[in-house]
Design a protein with these regions (language model features):
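N-terminal pre-catalytic "stem/leader" segment of glycosyltransferase-like enzymes
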Residues: 1-83, 88-93, 104, 273-278, ...
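Alpha-helix capping/helix-boundary segments
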Residues: 76, 102, 127-129, 175, ...
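Membrane-proximal helix-turn-helix segments that form the acceptor-binding/catalytic region
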Residues: 89-91, 102-121
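A short, active-site helix/loop in glycosyltransferases that binds the activated sugar's phosphate group
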Residues: 106-107, 118-142
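Conserved catalytic-core segment of nucleotide-activated headgroup transferases in glycan assembly
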Residues: 150-225
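Nucleotide-sugar-dependent
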Residues: 222-264, 270-278
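A short acidic/histidine/glycine-rich donor-binding loop in glycosyltransferase catalytic cores
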Residues: 283-289
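A charged, aromatic-enriched C-terminal amphipathic alpha-helix characteristic of glycosyltransferases
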Residues: 290-293, 297, 303-333
Length: 333
């Protein structure tokens, strides 16, 4: 029978990389023979859920023709509990790919029954899998993505061989990245040059070793430059701990920044305690550090052999994630 993926009809912002991960998943699923099971969501001002019930009414009949259903979790739609309820009442083989989990921040997972119903649950990292197993999930049903795929339209021009330079790219929401304010005033980091990519540059982020590079469409990486790509968050240069359980969440999460940098052929710098640190080390994808203040010495001490291993590892992984191999591997079993 036909395999389907649930598609909630909603607009996306072309410059918002947060919407790129689910869009890439949909494209890979189409290539693998999945068809969209489309549901048009009502307006968010449908407070009583009257229009939602009308919009979601066809879902029950649509589910009857599906042989398998793939869901990206969480999905955002008004009164989404109505959709979940209909899915829970079917006996469809269900695959759920997790993008985010409130329970990792100490919150309550309102749609936990949907996760537990999944025949195949795809999560970010081994750490996220271990967490769910402690919550009573069946580990045999959990597949680990390691990092998200990142499909591209345009790559940067052919880069010279990796030499372990001091130019470090950071792409994302610059307004929320509090640690950026501390970069220019830190003498230990004065030998490094940070290239900042984002929609706007905060007024309190400035310095001789910082250059604002503007923004780019997530699928067009031609303007992304740097010797390294930085995956960091929080309010400190010496750790990724921050408010709202940020540090704890990074222990499980695979940031989409990681995929962005690797897709462009750029080695990465990640927090040693993050959920992706082991993946980065095992595949020779860059450096893992406890503090950004370690970077000048760590970069300077790199041997030619280590640089060659990183260059090779990044090249192999870049090819995989640009062709959707991470998700395809999870779909095989």
């Amino acid at each position: 029978m036909q395999r389907y993926f649930l598609k909630i009809i909603a607009p996306r912002d072309a410059f918002n990389a947060e919407g790129k991960a689910p869009a890439d998943v949909e494209n890979i699923l189409r290539q693998e023979g999945f068809k969209p099971l489309e549901i048009r969501a009502p307006r968010w001002d449908d407070l009583l859920g009257i229009n939602a019930r009308l919009c979601y009414q066809p879902l029950e009949k649509l589910l009857q023709k599906a042989g398998e259903l793939f869901i990206q979790y969480p999905f955002y739609a008004p009164h989404s509990h109505l959709i979940i309820r209909k899915i829970l009442h079917t006996n469809l083989p269900l695959t759920v790919l997790v993008h985010d989990l409130d329970m990792l921040r100490g919150g309550r997972e309102e749609s936990e029954p949907l996760l537990r119903k999944a025949k195949r649950l795809i999560v970010h990292t081994e750490a996220m899998k271990a967490f769910l197993c402690k919550q009573g999930f069946n580990g045999e049903n959990i597949k680990v993505l390691q990092c998200f795929d990142y499909l591209v339209e345009h790559l940067p021009a052919q880069k010279p061989s990796f030499t372990g330079g001091n130019d470090i790219a950071f792409a994302g929401n610059l307004e929320k990245s509090e640690f950026l304010k501390l970069l220019s005033g830190n003498k230990i980091l004065s030998s490094l040059h940070f290239l900042l990519y984002g929609a706007t540059l905060p007024k309190d982020v400035f310095g001789e070793n910082l250059t604002y590079q503007g923004c780019f469409r997530p699928a067009d990486l031609r303007t992304l430059n740097g010797s390294w790509g930085l995956v960091w968050d929080g309010e400190s240069l010496t750790t990724c701990q921050g408010s709202h359980g940020l540090g704890e969440y990074l222990r499980y999460n695979a940031s989409h920044k990681l995929s962005l940098y690797l897709a462009s052929g750029m080695p990465v710098i990640v927090w040693q305690e993050s959920g992706v640190a082991a993946f980065v080390n095992q595949n020779h994808l860059g450096l893992t550090v406890n503090s950004l203040e370690e970077l000048p010495e760590r970069i300077e001490r790199l041997t030619e052999n280590e640089k060659a291993l990183i260059s090779e590892g990044v090249g192999i992984m870049s090819e995989k994630i640009r062709h959707g191999e991470m998700l395809r591997n999870c779909l095989k079993n």
